[in-house]
Each structure stands twice: as C-alpha cells, then as structure tokens.
Amino acid sequence: MIDLARIPGPIELEGEVCVIGAGAAGISLTRRLLRLGHNVVLLESGGLDYEPATAGLNAGETVGEDYYDLEDSRLRFFGGTTAIWGGRCAELDPIDLEKRDYVPHSGWPIGWEELERWYGEARPLFGLPARRPAPEDLRRAGVDLPQFDELETPLWTFDRRFNRFAWESCGDLEADPRCQIVTHATVTDRKSVV
C-alpha cells in the first residue's frame, strides 16, 4: 500500500485500470478486474480510518428529507461508508428507473433489464441469496405474511458481516502484485491517456 500522506513529492503509477474509491463498489470492481487478469490502481481519498480533515471534503447541503450531514454519512477511508452501514441491502424496483412527471430529474439512461442482470452477480458479494427474495419464499418457509391484493410486500436483505470491505478483510488485494492501493489520494481531475 502506498500512503500519499507519507510521501513528500509526486509519484508515478502504472496500471491498466484506475479505480477511484475503495468503498463497496470500488473494492468489488477491483476484485473482478484482478480476476480477469488486469493490473489495477485503487485510489482512496482517505486513509485506513476516519480523519476529520478528509471527512470535511464531503461538506455540503442535504436537501429533501431530513438526514445526517454529508460529512457524517459519507465516509472517506478504506471501506467507505460500509464502516457505519448496517448491512441493509435494497435493490431498486423497475419504477425507480422510469421517468415520472412528478419526480424532477427522474429517469435513468438504462432500463430495468440491464440493471437486473447485474444483481445476480452482486448479491454473493454481500453474502446474499443468488436471487431476490420474494414474499412467497418466506411463506413457504413458514413466515405468516399478510396477503395483499393491491400492495406489494417490500423485503430487505441484510449482510451479516459488517466489515466485509474493511481493510482487515481485504488482504487479498494487498497481497496481489497486480493491485496498487493508494490512500490519501483524493482525485480532483482526470485526463485520458488513450
């Protein structure tokens, strides 16, 4: 691991792919790229633990529903916000991707089918069942759920291993010679070299 907070000057790194952010998505993507044989540079804005100065980079205003300050609810260190995450996993529903007149800026550039095909690959990364649970699955298992004609029963799944993306759970990345992990590496600009 390279900690830019301990290096006085600029350094040069080479890799086929640069992944920005060592949270759940960045770590999962890095693992996949390594499995495919790529050389990866994984950049993390923070260090290995919470630092107020780095957290301050997230300062901003939240709008809409009352919620925690951004610098307290979006963490910049290895493992990202999963450090305060309860493991609750909710997949998007088809309507979440659709354009709705009553929701400003709604509508995704991809459809539900495009997103859904990736959920099957993502679920095992969090120790979740290979397919999305349905109310019928719970009823078959003996859970007494009410029957609704018009309402859908929302189900949540939980990752019971809360530290899945913490530094101590990522020894595979540190040990892989094709992976360069760089901390205190806040990205402020990018340039294509292709």
Where are these regions (language model features)?
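Extreme N-terminal leader/targeting segments of oxidoreductases
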Residues: M1-V17, R35-L36
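Conserved beta-strand-loop-beta-strand element in the redox core of flavoprotein oxidoreductases
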Residues: I2-L4, D189-V194
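N-terminal Rossmann-like FAD-binding beta1-loop-alpha1 element of flavoenzymes
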Residues: G15-L42
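Glycine-/small-residue-rich beta->alpha transition segments that form the dinucleotide
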Residues: G23-A24, G46-L48, T186
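Glycine-rich FAD pyrophosphate-binding loop
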Residues: L34-G56
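Redox-cofactor-proximal catalytic regions of oxidoreductases
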Residues: G60-P135
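Conserved redox-cofactor binding core of oxidoreductases
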Residues: D101-P104, W108-S192
